[in-house]
A protein has these predicted regions:
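N-terminal amphipathic/basic-hydrophobic helices that include classical n-h-c signal peptides
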Residues: 1-17
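Structured-RNA-binding interfaces characteristic of tRNA pseudouridine synthases
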Residues: 14-294
Length: 294
């Protein structure tokens, strides 16, 4: 708490480059994922960077804790970005001096001038221009070396399944409608074999992955309410489409297509073809990103 107050005081007293941490929620249904792409503006990162440019007049890169795929949602995505307030202050002063004789409103290239903003003001500004399916939940000054992805020590994802015979048309973008009951006990047994540190190459959607595919899953938890089943995955990091492939494999276990003890052989195979299919994107939520307390 003391360090957080110190960072906020530094921001208020005019420190130059400030690092900001934001927590975001979004409905990924109509977006092509987190990462900005040159051929579309339908990305979460792209929307946020457009608004920061509107606010500062500068190109500001936003770093996300993870690149959620198209159609994937987030309740607790974490991102960070830097703003050089000293630089902006100097630029604004020059622009105002240069355009001293111009009409009101032409002296600054940014829509809203007026110096540095507090974290709350930044959050308010961003939310004013974000579409209704994206929101910044919190904004705070972060340590200089904080990076939303590189500083993360754990993440929790949730996959939502609907096992009822009739699909809920109003929840179709947030649940994978299976239309059949699953053997959850068998799925829990299989999940027990997935926890711990393993080489998850068989559960990686990137066949050209050259970096280590070893990850640690701390726990896999199941919450069932009626015909709805939520599966929570917590680990130190996840490979591309890993949670969706894990879910697809656990579904096959629940359907009786795959014995729980086959999980060990799937891990040992280190072959994507050995695991089950990738579950659809719409059922997946990034729930939480954890960091070391300092």
């Amino acid at each position: 708490l003391a360090e957080k107050l110190q960072r906020e005081r530094a921001a208020e007293t005019g420190a130059g480059i400030m690092n900001y941490k934001v927590v975001m929620a979004y409905d990924g249904s109509r977006y092509n994922g987190w990462q900005k792409q040159g051929n579309t503006d339908k990305t979460i990162q792209g929307k946020l960077e457009q608004i920061l440019f509107k606010m500062t007049g500068e190109e500001i890169e936003v770093h996300g804790s993870g690149r959620t795929d198209a159609g994937v949602h987030a309740r607790g995505q974490v991102a960070n970005f830097h703003i050089d307030w000293k630089k902006l202050e100097v630029q604004e002063k020059r622009e105002l001096e240069k355009n001293a004789g111009n009409q009101a409103g032409q002296g600054c290239k940014r829509e809203k001038c007026g110096g540095k903003k507090t974290p709350d003001q930044i959050m308010e500004y961003i939310n004013e221009y974000l579409p209704e399916d994206i929101a910044v939940l919190s904004c705070e000054v972060a340590p200089e070396r904080f990076h939303s992805r590189l500083s993360a020590v754990r993440k929790t994802y949730c996959y939502q399944l609907e096992m009822g015979p009739k699909k809920d048309v109003f929840q179709r973008n947030y649940y994978y409608g299976l239309g059949e009951r699953l053997d959850v006990s068998a799925m829990k047994a299989a999940a027990g074999l997935l926890t711990g540190t393993h080489d998850f190459k068989s559960f990686c959607g990137n066949k050209k992955m050259k970096k280590s595919t070893v990850r640690t899953i701390e726990k896999i938890e199941f919450e069932q309410s009626g015909s709805r089943l939520h599966i929570y995955f917590t680990g130190n990091g996840f490979l591309q489409q890993m949670v969706r492939i894990l879910t697809g494999t656990l579904i096959e276990v629940g359907q009786g297509k795959c014995a729980p003890d086959k999980i060990t052989r799937i891990l040992d195979a280190q072959d994507r073809q050995a695991a089950g299919p990738s579950a659809p994107a719409q059922g997946l939520f990034l729930v939480n990103v954890g960091y070391e307390d300092k």
